[in-house]
């Protein structure tokens, strides 16, 4: 016997009322924040991030931007159904244009012909369900690019640091500044804009790269120090691109090493991301270079672990988890142009994550990595 229509209508009205009240309750901070309260938050934020302005007019202009940022954050976080949170960070007083021009320094279009089939999906291939190169000691601590659009250099260096650790067993923090000062090309111009693969090519042509300790970061363009450029502590042999728009191939690559990627980071949600699994909104007009250092699944949601170069004050101590396995270009275009450096060992192939952390989960055949049933299986 069905329920009376009057009962169904009353139930719908009841739950609709509860939903409205819940949203109103969660968003109460939007209406309860007084101007004095927001001003106090702003002044605390200024102290935390060491911000100061030359005039009262500039202070007030930045305060208005801060208020809009805070409103966006409150509105976003009031929705308890969201998979991620946003929060106040060092970008809270910047306009969109200032943020883009200062922190987003990646440009696409270089060396698209060097696509390798090494990590093409193969029928029956099984991948680990979880990879985190941080736990294998192959990831240097979070760095900060500062007010320099050198994200391309940070991404390139992070993957070189990673493959060097995987092949040699030694983790060395390498010099982004050397790439910015000495690695300029027609398309790669230091703090202004750059290609990740131009960073790899510089290291190959130069015969190696110096350490961060010897050639420290300054967050600005400088003259190339030739003496320091000639000190070469880490080398790579070549670089390759993962098949484009193929998240399974990208996942396969990440089981063997951290991978450089680019994505669309221009939106407010990405800019102010603080925790959780980021699902957008974002497009696929890639403008920022980062590094994938792992992947996993939480609550049935697959994600990539992304290392950024915006200090530990952004995201999850400098990292982001971003939605994985959406197909095509991936979330925010993350699968559009993945690339990685190659450093040969006696097997001409890096050790897999599983072989370094757990008993080996892969064996090698003439066709590439072959897995055992401990994770995700690919089928055509």
Swiss-Prot record:
Repressed by the active-site-directed cysteine protease inhibitor E64 (L-trans-epoxysuccinyl-leucylamide-(4-guanido)-butane) produced by Aspergillus japonicus. Fruit. The active site is at 151, 288, 308. E64 binds at residue 151. GO terms for molecular function: cysteine-type endopeptidase activity. Gene3D superfamilies: 1.10.287.2250, Cysteine proteinases. Its EC number is 3.4.22.14. Cysteine protease responsible for the cleavage of kiwellin into kissper and KiTH. This is Actinidain. It comes from Actinidia chinensis var. chinensis. The lineage of its organism: Eukaryota, Viridiplantae, Streptophyta, Embryophyta, Tracheophyta.
């Amino acid at each position: 016997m069905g329920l009376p229509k009057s009962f169904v209508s009353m139930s719908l009205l009841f739950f609709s009322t509860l939903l409205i009240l819940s949203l109103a309750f969660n968003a109460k901070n939007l209406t309860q924040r007084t101007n004095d309260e927001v001003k106090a938050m702003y002044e605390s934020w200024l102290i935390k991030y060491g911000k100061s302005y030359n005039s009262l007019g500039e202070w007030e202009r930045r305060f208005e931007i801060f208020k809009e940022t805070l409103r966006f954050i409150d509105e976003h976080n009031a929705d308890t159904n969201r998979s991620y949170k946003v929060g106040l960070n060092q970008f809270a007083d910047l306009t969109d244009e200032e943020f883009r021009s200062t922190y987003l320094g990646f440009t696409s279009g270089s060396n698209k012909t060097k696509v390798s089939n090494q990590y093409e999906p193969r029928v029956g291939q099984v991948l680990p369900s979880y990879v985190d190169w941080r736990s294998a000691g192959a990831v240097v601590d979070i760095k900060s690019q500062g007010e320099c659009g050198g994200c391309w250099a940070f991404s390139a260096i992070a993957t070189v640091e990673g493959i060097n650790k995987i092949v040699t067993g030694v983790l060395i923090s390498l010099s982004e500044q050397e790439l910015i000062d000495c690695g300029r090309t027609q398309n790669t111009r230091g703090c202004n804009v750059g290609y990740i693969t131009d960073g790899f090519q510089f290291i190959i042509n130069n015969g190696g790269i110096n350490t961060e300790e010897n050639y420290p970061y300054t967050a600005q363009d400088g003259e190339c120090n030739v003496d320091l450029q000639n000190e070469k502590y880490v080398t790579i042999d070549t670089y390759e691109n993962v098949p484009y728009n193929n998240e399974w191939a990208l996942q396969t690559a990440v089981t063997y090493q951290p991978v450089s990627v680019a994505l669309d980071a221009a939106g407010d949600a990405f800019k102010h991301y603080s925790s959780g699994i980021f699902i957008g909104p974002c497009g696929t007009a890639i403008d920022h270079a980062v590094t994938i250092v792992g992947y996993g699944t939480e609550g049935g949601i697959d994600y990539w672990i992304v290392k950024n170069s915006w200090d530990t004050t952004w995201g999850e101590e400098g990292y982001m988890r971003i939605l994985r396995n959406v197909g095509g270009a991936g979330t925010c275009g993350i699968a559009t142009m993945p690339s990685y450096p190659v450093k040969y060992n006696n097997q001409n192939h890096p050790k897999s994550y599983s072989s370094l952390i757990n008993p080996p989960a892969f064996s090698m055949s003439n066709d590439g990595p072959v897995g055992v049933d401990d994770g995700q299986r690919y089928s055509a």
